[in-house]
Each structure stands twice: as structure tokens, then as C-alpha cells.
Amino acid sequence: HLLFNYDRRFGNVTTIFAGNILYTNSLSVISQSGFEKEKIEMVMNLFINEYKNVNESQTLDLLFEFEDTSLDDWNIMASKRAASLFNCTIQTGAILAGASPNECEILKKVATNIGFSFDITDDIIGTFASELEYGRPSGGDIKIGKKPLHIIYTLELLKGKEFKEFKTLLEKKNPTKDEIQWIKTK
């Protein structure tokens, strides 16, 4: 008798451990890269800060499943998610290449916009693409109560009975395919 399958037991845990190992490996590579000490320190601090931001964003994303979420809430969360990853990558290159503080600030804004674009695109694909196109069941985020930007906007735009129905279905555990489809049409 198996209480759980191998993937369920080791899949997510292994992924988290592998990510932690890769993160520490990246810090090791940077620390031994041979760049000037000041640049290495700046990049290490950047990695630490953006790693913290990504984890904060994931925590916020989970909490949003259980709370009403505003556009401001989403912006805070999204500014720390993919935007942090793009910022870390772009800033690392800029710092090591000797970019000025002004250039780094401009690149940070670019990274934030790229990150927002990535998150919005990923959420739209996750909601509307077929399983064949996306590799996951369509509407999976809706099914678990996530609140991507387009759902937050929909909640702000709907009124009366439609708002109540929409919100009720979003809060429902395991909505049916028909209910998910109804949410998609709003």
C-alpha cells in the first residue's frame, strides 16, 4: 500500500531543495568570479535582496487566495516576483560591466516592466490556453483561488448579481469545468 506516489512525495520537495542548492552555487560562483571586491559585494547583496523579494511575492500570492486583493496589492506582489528575477539578472550584468548608478536605475525600471509583462502573459495563458497549448489544465489558477491581474480587474468591474456569482465561484473549492468556463467569459 502506497499512501502517496513518488512524485507527490519527492517532486515539490526536491524542486525546492534543488533551487536552494542552485542559489547557493550561484553565490559561490559570484564570490569566486575574480571581479573587483566592491562589484562582487554589490552583486551578492542584489542576489540576497531579490531572493528575499521573490519569496515574499510567493507568500503574498498564496495569501491572496484567501483574501480580497486590490490592484495595489497585486502591484506590490508582482514587483517582487518575475520583476525581481529579471532585475537580478539585468543588474548583475550591469554592475559587473561597470554601469553607472543612473544606468542601473533605468535598467531596474526596464526589468520591472519585463517582469510585469511576463506575469500578466503567464496568467492570461494559464487562464485561457488549452491544456495542449499550456501543458497544464486550463484555468488551474482559478481552480485554486489565485487572483491574477485580470481577475482583480474583473472583480472591480462587475456589479450586483454578477459580482456575487463571480466571487462565489472564485471562492469555491474545486469549481467545475463549466463554472471555470463561466468565470473565463467575464
Kindly give the residue locations of the regions a language model identified.
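Mg2+-dependent prenyl diphosphate-binding active-site environment of isoprenoid biosynthetic enzymes
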Residues: 1-163
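Mobile late-domain/C-terminal helix-loop "cap" segments
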Residues: 158, 164-186
